[in-house]
């Protein structure tokens, strides 16, 4: 078993770490940075860019630059959040088997495939850093991710060629990194405000045990939403001044997004910033420029309700943990958006104590994931991690009611059973609708899947005993089974979530990803062969021009023809590696006569020496 890497697969940025030498270390990417933008771009030349290179070209290629893909991970196309994402994101979101996917140049990609490309870059960079193959990982998800979102994340890892040993909640991971060396028992709160999600978790740490007491959050609240408030403000101001709806222009919208994100960051240290976007658009009267000052106070007023929402979540989670805020020992701030001064001020005022900012908010989650990897590998001893289910799990029963089988806040892994019966006389089958959520009515909760148990023996209603068992593993992924206790017949469903991907489709995507890797390697080989050929043609031409007089005409023409043939091959975009190598070999052979002529000339120019000391011998 090789090294297990911990991956924080973020909405905005991703990070990775490894546990070695009794400590967790952040792994820098090939660009030398500790975080990698979670961005994938498709260029007109057919290239796929990931990370910094994708981010750099986003303004000129907005419709084919995919960011914030985590926001639609495991999301059904008909959900309100999908409609909201569709309005905000410049790329096309489409329906694929009822789930969200994206369309680029007529080809449909699932969020899992896009996320897999990010994970593949992280995997390759980790292999470069560690000097060995990496096949296993622990990947983090927001604590409030539902079953389908967790399953989709694991599928992304599989497509990327990773065996995902564990899916771990982000705040739990942060607490693991923070609390590993804590001997005294502490009740800590992790406030995790990332690029696209918000989680708050209350945990008890001490004596190498990290136990989650309660968790809550919003899978659609994060730094992106703060950016969107600035975008809306700037677009509204621009429209009132010019009459132009700038958000209809995808290139202008991408420039606005980058400007809003930069303004947000600048306002964390400055009281005012200027947004200056020349030639943002044009109309019949000529080009238009967007120049606007934004104060910290205005930014705070634009995002006031978002901050208020996070405080509301803190209140409910502390209550769920059975604690008061005075019993919280430490508040650990995680996620890049916790750098916003007003966010810190709000949390500090509510909890009434100084915030712990000793951890790097961008890196601590990946560090914790690598520690969990160390636990699974056996490198970290005697650490016990007790996580909980973020939402209740149950089934739909008579009258459209949700009956809970596993309650929210149950420590996982967990297995629970309940006995149900039929609603009608001589009912031959029952349909089991699996649900996740806290609402009383089934229709108000998220449907995770449905299966039928057939062959129930004829009997009056209420007599058959149908035992339904919910089995949730350490990744928070669910299997549900139903058994007729009279006949022994049973049926089970491993919840595949709303990803819309079958095992065969996932397998195909794994092969496609591997195939793409081979294609890239072949393209690289062609490029290297082309570069070598171009270099040889250039050097030989230079030498031929210089020493042509030392060759007979036939030899000179033969070499020139070989140079010309190789140059033509280099210019041919469709030339194969074999063709380039063949033409290179022919030139190398023809150029041997040139080398001989150059050597003869050098020998002729050197003064003759006595050969008294020369020994006549063969050298092997």
Swiss-Prot record:
HAMAP family: DnaK (MF_00332). It comes from Helicobacter pylori (strain ATCC 700392 / 26695) (Campylobacter pylori). Induction: By stress conditions e.g. heat shock. This is Chaperone protein DnaK. GO terms for molecular function: ATP binding; ATP hydrolysis activity; ATP-dependent protein folding chaperone; heat shock protein binding; protein folding chaperone; unfolded protein binding. The modification Phosphothreonine is found at residue 197. CDD domains: ASKHA_NBD_HSP70_DnaK-like (cd10234). Belongs to the heat shock protein 70 family. GO terms for biological process: chaperone cofactor-dependent protein refolding; protein refolding. Acts as a chaperone. The lineage of its organism: Bacteria, Pseudomonadati, Campylobacterota, Epsilonproteobacteria, Campylobacterales. It comes from the Bacteria. The keyword Transcription does not apply. Coiled coil: none annotated. Disulfide bonds: none annotated. Keywords: ATP-binding, Chaperone, Nucleotide-binding, Phosphoprotein, Stress response. The keyword Transmembrane helix does not apply.
């Amino acid at each position: 078993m090789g090294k297990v890497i911990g991956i924080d697969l973020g909405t905005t940025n991703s990070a990775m770490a490894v546990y070695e030498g009794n400590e967790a270390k952040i792994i820098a990417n090939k660009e030398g940075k500790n975080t990698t933008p979670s961005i994938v771009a498709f260029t007109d030349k057919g290239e796929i860019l990931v990370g910094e290179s994708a981010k750099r070209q986003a303004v000129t290629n907005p419709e084919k630059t995919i960011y914030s893909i985590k926001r639609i991970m495991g999301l059904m196309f008909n959900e309100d959040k999908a409609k909201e994402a569709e309005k905000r994101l410049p790329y096309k979101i489409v329906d694929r088997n009822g789930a969200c996917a994206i369309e680029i140049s007529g080809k449909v990609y699932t969020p899992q495939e896009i996320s897999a490309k990010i994970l593949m870059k992280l995997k390759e960079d980790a292999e470069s850093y560690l000097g060995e193959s990496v096949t296993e990982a622990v990947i983090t998800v927001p604590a409030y991710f539902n079953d389908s979102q967790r399953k989709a994340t694991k599928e992304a890892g599989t497509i990327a060629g990773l065996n995902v040993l564990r899916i771990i909640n982000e705040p739990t991971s942060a607490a693991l990194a923070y609390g590993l060396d804590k001997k005294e028992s502490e009740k800590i709160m992790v406030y995790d405000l990332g690029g696209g999600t918000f989680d708050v978790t209350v945990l008890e740490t001490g004596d190498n045990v990290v136990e989650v007491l309660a968790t809550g959050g919003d899978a659609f609240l994060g730094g992106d939403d703060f950016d969107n408030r600035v975008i809306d403000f700037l677009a509204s101001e621009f429209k009132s001044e010019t009459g132009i709806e700038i958000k209809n222009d995808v290139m202008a919208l991408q420039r606005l997004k980058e400007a809003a994100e930069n303004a947000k960051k600048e306002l964390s240290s400055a009281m005012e910033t200027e947004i200056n976007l020349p030639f943002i658009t044009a109309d019949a009267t000529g080009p238009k420029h967007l120049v606007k000052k934004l104060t910290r106070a205005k930014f705070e007023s634009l995002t006031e309700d978002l901050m208020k929402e996070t405080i509301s979540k803190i209140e409910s989670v502390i209550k769920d943990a059975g604690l008061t805020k005075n019993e919280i020992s430490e508040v650990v701030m995680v996620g890049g958006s916790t750098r916003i001064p007003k966010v810190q001020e709000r949390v500090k005022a509510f909890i009434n104590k100084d915030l712990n900012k000793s951890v790097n908010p961008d890196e601590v989650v990946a560090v914790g994931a690598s520690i969990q990897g160390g636990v699974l590998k056996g490198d970290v001893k005697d650490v016990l991690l007790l996580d909980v289910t973020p939402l209740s799990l149950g089934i739909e029963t008579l009258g459209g009611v949700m009956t809970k089988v596993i309650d929210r806040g149950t420590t996982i892994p967990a297995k629970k059973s309940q006995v149900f019966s039929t609603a009608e006389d001589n009912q031959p089958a029952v349909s089991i609708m699996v649900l996740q959520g806290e609402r009383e009515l089934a229709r108000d909760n998220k449907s995770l899947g449905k299966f039928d148990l057939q062959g129930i023996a004829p009997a009056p209603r209420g007599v058959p005993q149908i035992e339904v068992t919910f089995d949730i593993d350490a990744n928070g992924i669910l299997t549900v089974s139903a058994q007729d206790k009279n006949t022994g017949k049973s049926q089970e469903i491993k919840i595949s979530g709303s990803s819309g991907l079958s095992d065969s489709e996932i397998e195909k995507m794994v092969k496609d990803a591997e195939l793409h890797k081979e294609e890239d390697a072949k393209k690289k080989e062609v490029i290297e062969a082309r570069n070598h050929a171009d270099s040889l043609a250039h050097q030989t031409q230079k030498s031929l021009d210089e020493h042509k007089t030392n060759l007979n005409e036939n030899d000179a023409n033969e070499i020139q023809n070989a140079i010309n043939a190789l140059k033509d091959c280099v210019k041919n975009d469709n030339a194969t590696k074999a063709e380039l190598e063949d033409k290179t070999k022919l030139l190398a052979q023809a150029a041997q006569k040139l080398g001989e002529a150059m050597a003869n000339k050098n020998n002729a120019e050197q003064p003759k020496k006595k050969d008294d000391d020369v020994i006549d011998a063969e050298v092997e």
